[in-house]
Amino acid sequence: VEAEEGGLFRSDDGGETWEKLSDNADIRGRPWYFTHIFADPQNPDIIWDLCYNVWKSIDGGRTFAQVTTPHGDNHDLWIDPRNPQRMINGNDGGACVSYNGGASWSSIYNQPTAEFYHVAADNHYPYRVHGTQQDSSAIRVPSRSYKGAILMSDCDPVGFSESGDIAVKPDDPEISYSVYPGGIIN
């Protein structure tokens, strides 16, 4: 619960009664958006908390230690029920795999991953899609390529606009406008 008196609570009777385990504010950042709790399928004392960062408890949720991951804004976690050392973490940067219980993670730089909030097409031929990405820049991507695939070298940054809106000037497809949270216009 994200509140002044919030925390992590546990019920062992289907919600009839609750015990407050922790009031650590670090583990409850933006709970309405992405805080999720995961229990190890083989050890009930191991609890994972995902929010901005990843947190791990080995004492049933009373204390937590931060776990380093390749990217922030962690949204989801899959724990292999037969081998809890094997996990997949979904975050704003993509997906990261661990084979050692979160001690290390695979890179996010080996996969074309983007989380787009807004897109717009321009009048260029062939048309290009302009988009604002979560935790990254605004980008312009061609709709096709003569190289057999659309490569990153075919794409262009068109400003910085995490999750803001984007528009392309109708009479000049080389000009785009993007809005960054906080009212900054690029």
Language model features: what each stretch is:
Residues V1-N186:
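Beta-propeller blade termini and top-face loops
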